[in-house]
Structures are given as C-alpha cells and as structure tokens.
C-alpha cells in the first residue's frame, strides 16, 4: 500500500509538468488533447509497468488546464489556473478520493528547487496529428546529483494561450503546445505523443474540486499512509 501511494505521488509530480502548456501568438485553443504514452528503453518488470499510464488527456479552457492519467491504482488529475497561479491535484485511488491544493508559494518553491534547464531550438520539423511541429532539445542539469540529461520536444505554434506553463520548471521556454515530448524521472523515460487534438467547448466544472473529494495536504496524506 505504501509503495502504491508513493508511486501515485511520483505520477502527481509528473502532472505538474504535463498539464502546463504555453502557446504562441496563434489562435486561442479550447478543447482536448489526447496523448499516447510509451516507455523507451524501459527494463522494468511487466507487473510494475502495469501501474503506469498508457495515455493522457489534457483539457484546456481560458486560463485553466486539466491533465488526467489513469493508472493501475486509479485516476490522478491536476488542475492549473495560470491567472491565479494555483494547482489542484485530485487523487482517486482504491476507493478513496483526495484533493490537494498547491498555492503560489508552494509552486514557486518547487520551481526554485527544480534542476536548471536550457533549451536549444532547431530548424527540424515534424508533422504530428496534422500540425507542423518544430524541434527543441531541453538539457536538464541537476547540480545536486551531478547529472545532465537531454529531452526532445516537438511543439506547434499554431495556438495561443498565454501563461499556461507559467510554473513549468522544465519546459517554460517552449513557445508552443508540445505535441511530442519526453520526461525522465527516477530513471524512467516517458514519451508523450499527441494522438488526437479536438477543438470543442469544455465545461468549467472540469476545473473544480468534486464534492465527494476530501480536501487535504500532501503532508497530511503522507501521514495517513505511514509517512512514505
């Protein structure tokens, strides 16, 4: 149980990165983006991989974005408000539902503690889900453990949605919606590729805490499961 909850928190930290997009000076976007998730070079046991998501949905409306992952333990979502600068993580696991709210101060603290990153923009392009994307290489340097890694990003500049990745410590310099990108955490490389982009109206209810969720903090939730 404790390991399962720890995995949920790792995936929740993924969402703080995945749900936050910046859009260039194109047209405003409202709708849903679906991503296929693969694990290149993974040598994890099949039973462990069953705990990780195979797809992700991102809902975008005005200053809001919401990212949803279904895992072997349940559903994990992250809501981000770029105007008021807060995020809400929703955990629906093993019959229990929790909501964790992160303030501007908490978000800024996580940004300050994140490894530094540099972005190299390239001329190479690639068509993904019907959109021409530009390539960028993000180099992440972790001074604490003395490591350096490179992540590949393909992004489209056809949409406009200001400040949606305001608090993204890794991809904050990408000037467009990321339709293919990688993230490496604890040695696990995850690759996200947009499989569909649907322009449609999104209800504001998607970005609110459901009534049947218990509002708590990360510290309180960890204490409930033995500190992790």
Model region roles, listed by residue range:
Residues 23-228:
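Extended soluble regions of mature proteins
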Residues 1-28:
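Bacterial Sec-dependent N-terminal signal peptides
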């Amino acid at each position: 149980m404790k390991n399962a909850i720890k995995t949920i928190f790792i995936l929740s930290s993924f969402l703080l990165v995945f749900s936050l997009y910046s859009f260039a000076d194109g047209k405003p976007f409202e709708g849903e983006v679906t991503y296929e998730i693969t694990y290149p070079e993974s040598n994890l046991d099949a039973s462990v991989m069953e705990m990780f998501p195979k797809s992700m949905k991102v809902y975008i409306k005005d200053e809001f974005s919401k990212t949803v992952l279904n895992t072997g333990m349940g559903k994990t979502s992250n809501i981000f408000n770029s105007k008021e600068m807060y995020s809400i993580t929703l955990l629906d696991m093993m019959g229990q539902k929790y909501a964790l709210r992160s303030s501007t101060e908490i978000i800024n603290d996580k940004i300050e503690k994140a490894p530094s990153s540099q972005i190299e923009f390239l001329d190479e392009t690639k068509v993904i889900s019907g959109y021409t994307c530009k390539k960028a290489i993000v180099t992440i340097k972790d001074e604490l453990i003395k490591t350096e890694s490179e992540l590949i990003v393909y992004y489209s500049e056809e949409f406009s949605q200001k400040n949606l990745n305001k608090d993204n410590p890794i991809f904050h310099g990408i000037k467009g919606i990321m339709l293919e990108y990688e993230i490496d955490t604890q040695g696990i490389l995850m690759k996200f590729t947009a499989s569909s982009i649907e322009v449609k109206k999104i209800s504001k209810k998607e970005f609110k805490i459901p009534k049947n969720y218990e509002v708590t903090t990360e510290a309180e939730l960890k204490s409930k499961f033995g500190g992790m």
